[in-house]
């Protein structure tokens, strides 16, 4: 799947993206996750979508040449799982949403901003890269701990979390 043989049928449905993106994440291939999401979901946005569709916007599977049958399908929402975990780097460290790791992977991006819903409220993270410096702003509800952890995409960079330099 990560290195498909020539002639292999490509993923044709957003339903399979969950498994594909999961495999990429396990292999530490965050940049490819972002590329796959952009490749397969950007065409929906280009058509004015505000939800995720049942099928990718390739070809004409619906009537009147419109590229889908249904405009809202939970099975198509894999990016909602992976973007906070990979690009924002927010992952749980303790049961009940009481502690989270913040370890954003840059994935070839210059900035990212978002939040992860938790039982106590949102964990929000934004980051911006400027040259060799990465500024991360993170916040969590009262009683929720955040722990920063470096990853390979941050190696050699001057990282600041909420204005404090990180080693």
Model feature map: region roles:
Residues 31-167:
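Non-catalytic C-terminal accessory modules of carbohydrate-active enzymes
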Residues 1-17, 63-75:
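Solvent-exposed loop and edge beta-strand segments that line ligand/cofactor-binding
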Residues 12-26, 75-85:
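Well-ordered alpha-helical segments within folded domains of soluble proteins
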């Amino acid at each position: 799947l990560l290195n498909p043989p020539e002639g292999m049928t490509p993923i044709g449905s957003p339903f399979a993206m969950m498994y594909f993106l999961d495999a990429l994440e396990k292999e530490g291939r965050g940049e490819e996750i972002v590329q796959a999401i952009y490749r397969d979901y950007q065409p929906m946005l280009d058509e004015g979508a505000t939800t995720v569709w049942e099928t990718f916007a390739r070809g004409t599977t619906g009537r009147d040449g419109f590229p889908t049958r249904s405009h809202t399908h939970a099975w198509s929402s894999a990016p909602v799982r992976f973007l906070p975990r990979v690009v924002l780097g927010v992952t749980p460290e303790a049961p009940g949403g009481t502690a989270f790791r913040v370890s954003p992977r840059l994935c070839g991006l210059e900035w990212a901003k978002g939040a992860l819903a938790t039982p106590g409220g949102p964990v929000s993270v934004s980051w911006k890269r400027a040259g060799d410096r990465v500024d991360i702003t993170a916040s969590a509800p009262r009683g929720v701990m955040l722990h920063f952890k470096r990853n390979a995409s941050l190696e050699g960079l001057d990282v600041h979390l909420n204005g404090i330099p990180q080693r």
